[in-house]
Amino acid sequence: MRIGLVCSGGDCAGMNPATKKFVEYSLELGYEPYFIREGLEGLIEGKIEPATLKEVSGILHKGGTILQSSRSKRFFDPAFRLQAYQNLQRHSIEALVTLGGDGSFRAMEVLAKEHSLLYAGIPATIDNDIRASDYALGVDSALNVILESTDRLRDTAESFRRAFVVEVMGRDCGYLALASAIACGAEVCIIPEMGYSLQSLGARLKEELGTGKRRYVLAIVSEGAKASSEVVSWLKEEVGIETRITILGHVQRGGSPSVYDRLMGFRFMQKALDSLSLGKSGVVVLREGRVEFLSSQEASSAPASLPLDMVRLASRLMF
């Protein structure tokens, strides 16, 4: 069987370790691995080629993806999906592994249903917003970037008796903000899934700053909460502390993958290929420490939620 690998949507650390495992394990199973370059746009344009061990040698430490990625509006046009499938047919590719997020998985599901194609989706997004999975590739590496940045900002905040508002990525999911706020010892955490009370937070912070218990404030705000400017104004005008804002942006996606992301890349890919070899299509997920393979329907119907124990840990940072 010939199997293709495509990276779709936003890049993240962990994609390259998964890519290396794709080639090595496919060959071990007796399959022929193929690379699709430049994401779904590359699939439409026919940028498909045989994958070799030489290409994946020495890529474990590299961030992003050696295959390159893209976002493709054209893929939602049936005519372009047919073109993509015909490109797969030219290479006799019977199955696809997709590294990406929910949008990429939905696109693959449509293509698979239209043309009886096997596919396996592997969560790869720093947003960690795949409903059925506790984890997506890139999250741990992104958190390490955030932690390094907040540790540095804390140094300068304490030196000048300032507040820093740090906006982190995550779209509509507050996992990155929640986890990093707990881990870096932030005083404020604002995420889209939870309400917050600046009034009660302000009373506590003013008391601590006024009595000398605290010299600085670190606030972590998820981009999806759309509250960074509000928090900056509140800290300046209500709490009464000089405030700066830092938007970390795409730096969170880059850099060498962490040990955990490398291991999860291997585990996710092995499960994906094992499932395809059994004729199954669906999505690889991590649930309660176990790597599982779910049908697309099971994966999409799972409720969206943050870990309750983490929410409890951070409750003092919101109210």
From Swiss-Prot:
EC identifiers of the protein: 2.7.1.11
An example Gene Ontology molecular-function term: 6-phosphofructokinase activity
Binding positions (substrate): T125, I126, D127, R162, M169, G170, R171, E223, R244, H250, V251, Q252, R253
Binding locations of ATP: G10, R71, S72, G101, D102, G103, S104
Compartment(s) of residence: Cytoplasm
Binding site for Mg(2+): D102
Binding locations of ADP: R154, G185, A186, E187
Transmembrane segments: none
Principal cellular location given in the protein's record: cytoplasm
Keyword field: Allosteric enzyme, ATP-binding, Cytoplasm, Glycolysis, Kinase, Magnesium, Metal-binding, Nucleotide-binding, Transferase
Pathway(s) the chain acts in: Carbohydrate degradation; glycolysis; D-glyceraldehyde 3-phosphate and glycerone phosphate from D-glucose: step 3/4
Cofactor list: Mg(2+)
Catalytic activity as recorded in UniProt: beta-D-fructose 6-phosphate + ATP = beta-D-fructose 1,6-bisphosphate + ADP + H(+)
Active-site residues annotated for this sequence: D127
Keyword Kinase: yes
Pfam families linked to this entry: PFK
UniProt record similarity statement: Belongs to the phosphofructokinase type A (PFKA) family. ATP-dependent PFK group I subfamily. Prokaryotic clade 'B1' sub-subfamily.
Listed name of the protein: ATP-dependent 6-phosphofructokinase
Source species of the chain: Wolinella succinogenes (strain ATCC 29543 / DSM 1740 / CCUG 13145 / JCM 31913 / LMG 7466 / NCTC 11488 / FDC 602W) (Vibrio succinogenes)
